[in-house]
Regions:
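Catalytic strand-loop segment that frames the active site of acyl-thioester-processing enzymes
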Residues: 1-32
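Hydrophobic beta-strand-centered segment that forms part of the acyl-chain substrate-binding groove
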Residues: 45-78
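Generic structural detector for well-ordered beta-strands
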Residues: 9-15, 66, 112-114
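C-terminal output/interaction extensions
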Residues: 112-131
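Residues at secondary-structure transition points
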Residues: 31-35, 72, 116
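Hydrophobic beta-sheet segments that form the core/acyl-binding groove
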Residues: 65-102
Length: 131
């Protein structure tokens, strides 16, 4: 049973490779939104991982976030995901996600993940190449 309130927190230091300028999502050398989003998704995936059975995985299906403040290269950033609800069939899991740096909140929102059978999911994906 997936427990509401389960959390995972991740931490990393912003490098030049993690900037908006480097990824092409902006022109400035500040922590890029795509990297913040990925960090939030990673925290959610990790929070859910211990509840999965063998052969299962999870995939992101929705991410609704804001990126509200810049973070410079060299500063630490943190992301947290907390399970807020689970669908009746147990296959869809909602999270509250947030990110902050050493000076305060930089972003937040919600994220949804679907629990999938990994082999079946990949087989359906490969079918796309064959059609």
């Amino acid at each position: 049973m997936i427990l509401i309130g389960t959390k995972c927190q991740l931490e990393q230091t912003v490098t030049r490779e993690l900037t908006a300028e480097a990824v092409g999502s902006g022109a400035l050398p500040v922590f890029g939104t795509p990297f913040m989003a990925a960090m939030m998704e990673n925290a959610a995936m990790t929070a859910l991982q211990s509840y999965l059975e063998e052969g299962q995985g999870s995939v992101g299906t929705r991410l609704d976030i804001t990126h509200d403040a810049p973070t410079p290269v060299g500063m630490k950033v943190f992301a947290e995901a907390e399970i807020t609800s689970v669908s009746e069939n147990g296959r869809m899991v909602d999270f509250r996600v947030s990110a902050w740096d050493e000076k305060g909140l930089i972003g937040g929102g919600t994220h949804t993940r679907a629990i999938i059978q990994s082999e079946r999911f990949l087989a359906k994906c490969i079918e796309k190449l064959e059609k």
